[in-house]
């Protein structure tokens, strides 16, 4: 049996196969890479207090419920943190909630703030807290839209949630006003989200 020499056709063929496999593997890795998740400030970063009770959500989550906070708007950690701290205190102390009621909140500069996050139930929408993620835009959006940065951050958060397995790939997007007695997320924002993917007109 002749020894295999460097530069022989066999070595060259094996090298080409390995090179091809490397390209295929790299392509698959790029396809599996997570979406560009938005900047998310964790609860400890905005000065949030620990939850008073731990009620976990079953994931992947089936519903996303959009709200607005009916507060002033904010940009930047300092201003948004003040609003969030006051909101959490009101929800825990006055409404007897375990935590701030929303899973995520979005400032007008497009920064996302962790509320109860993906893992814990919020208290945003009766009947949907255990099966839905509540996302609230900080501000009042009856007569106007959130900024483009805030809207894009919400879309990026949803795409990121699907990529990471937190949201079901066929999740349904709804407004709070569709399922409970509230004007949230405000008429103008309500009209906007009807054009988003996964919108469910009759929940």
Curated annotation (Swiss-Prot):
In larvae, it is expressed in fat body. Also expressed in uninduced hemocytes and mbn-2 cells. Residues 87-90, 97-102 are annotated as: Peptidoglycan binding. Residues 1-26 form the signal peptide. One of its GO terms (biological process) is response to peptidoglycan. It is found in: Secreted. Its main location: secreted. Changing residue 182 to Y: Abolishes PGN-binding and activation of Toll pathway. Disulfide bonds join 37-160, 74-80. Pfam families: Amidase_2. The record marks 182 as: Interacts with peptidoglycan. GO terms for molecular function: muramoyltetrapeptide carboxypeptidase activity; muramyl dipeptide binding; pattern recognition receptor activity; peptidoglycan binding; peptidoglycan immune receptor activity; zinc ion binding. Its EC number is 3.4.17.13. Changing residue 80 to Y: In seml; induces susceptibility to Gram-positive bacterial infection. Induction: Strongly up-regulated by PGN from B.subtilis. Regulated by both imd/Relish and Toll pathways. This is Peptidoglycan-recognition protein SA. It comes from Drosophila melanogaster. The gene is PGRP-SA.
